[in-house]
Every structure is written in C-alpha cells, then in structure tokens.
Amino acid sequence: MAVKIRLTRMGSKKKPFYRINVADSRSPRDGRFIETVGTYNPLVAENQVTLKEDRVLTWLANGAQPSDTVRNILSKEGVLKKFHDSKFSK
C-alpha cells in the first residue's frame, strides 16, 4: 500500500481550507484517509499552518511520500530539514 501525505479540501465555495491527511494513494482526494496530521489555510495573509510534527516525522520515516504542495509546506515549516538531519545523522 503506497501511502501519501496530501491535502484534502474543506470549506465552502471560493473559501478553501485544507486538512493535511495521510491516505492511501489509490483513494480519492476527499475520500478515505488514515490520519489527519495538520491543517492549512491559504486565505490568511501568512498562510496559517498547524502540524503535528511528531506524527509527520513518523509517517515520513515509515515511507509516506508527500505531495508537491505538502512538500513545499513541510519545507517552509522546517519539518523536512529535521527529517533529513535525523535520517543522515547516524
């Protein structure tokens, strides 16, 4: 089972709000997911992001692949740097 970390669209028309979910890559965008690990609100000036960093790092260590947009969000939040440092510090 290929697992991806990706965005699920919530909110109303013209006012999107996203949850950052861990899901099977074969499930639809807004369909079944395994776990919610954060939120992303692009409408706020500073693009409000909340993350459960420990859970994101756990999923990345277990082989979950982030989507392109989630990869950019994790990079801006510094999570990918922590993951890279923990992976190659051995």
Curated annotation (Swiss-Prot):
Sorted keywords for this record are:
Ribonucleoprotein, Ribosomal protein
What is any one GO biological process for this UniProt entry?
translation
Record-level Gene Ontology MF annotations? structural constituent of ribosome
Query: InterPro entries annotated for this entry?
Result: Ribosomal_bS16, Ribosomal_bS16_dom_sf
Disulphide bond pairs? none
Gene3D superfamilies (UniProt xref): 3.30.1320.10
Ligase recorded as keyword: no
Q: Looking at the Swiss-Prot or TrEMBL record, what is one Pfam family this protein matches?
A: Ribosomal_S16
Origin: domain of life? Bacteria
The keyword Transmembrane belongs to this UniProt entry's keyword annotation: no
PANTHER family assigned: 30S RIBOSOMAL PROTEIN S16, SMALL RIBOSOMAL SUBUNIT PROTEIN BS16M
NCBIfam families in the record:
S16
What name is this protein filed under?
Small ribosomal subunit protein bS16
Give the organism the record lists: Streptococcus pneumoniae serotype 19F (strain G54)
Gene assigned in the entry: rpsP
